[in-house]
């Protein structure tokens, strides 16, 4: 136990020293064209069309994990798009607004962010659903574009 504590202490000390020695100019930076709140809103404006093809340009292709309200997870954009298209077919209109609490955190070729999003969706039968949900996303710069490589959408169980 004593040896484990020493190893842990040494690791902690190395982290502190390394962090303190980091040049301020070497801090986390993203390119000037990193995602901002307007970019986030552009993504949700695309979702407001109820056609996932209109937001495909914002998502990385390949094996990436996306968590939506249901089902448990999607393992690729293709899988996500196929299922979401069926769900969205039940609606005639939608409006999504990224709230002022949106935060983006640059980390080199990645940017991670969080926001709450206000939603108003009208079913084909006229019923209106209104509420807010949580949105967490990770962007990666690929081919000069910021693409979502991981996303999590959830609703509180209130």
Label each region the model flagged:
Residues 1-8:
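Bacterial N-terminal signal peptides that target proteins for export
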Residues 20-61:
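Short, low-complexity N-terminal intrinsically disordered segments enriched in polar/charged residues
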């Amino acid at each position: 136990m004593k040896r484990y504590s020493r190893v842990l202490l040494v690791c902690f000390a190395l982290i502190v020293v390394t962090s303190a020695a980091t040049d301020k100019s070497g801090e986390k930076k993203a390119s000037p064209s990193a995602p901002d709140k307007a970019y986030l809103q552009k993504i949700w404006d695309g979702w407001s069309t109820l056609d996932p093809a209109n937001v495909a340009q914002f998502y990385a292709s390949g094996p990436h994990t996306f968590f939506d309200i249901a089902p448990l997870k999607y393992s690729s954009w293709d899988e996500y798009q196929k299922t979401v298209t069926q769900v969205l077919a039940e609606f005639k209109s939608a409006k999504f607004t990224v709230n002022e609490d949106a935060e983006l955190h640059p980390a080199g070729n990645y940017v991670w962010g969080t926001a709450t999003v206000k939603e108003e969706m009208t079913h084909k039968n006229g019923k209106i659903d209104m509420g807010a949900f949580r949105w967490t996303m990770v962007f990666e710069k690929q081919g000069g574009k910021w693409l979502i490589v991981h996303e999590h959408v959830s609703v509180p169980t209130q």
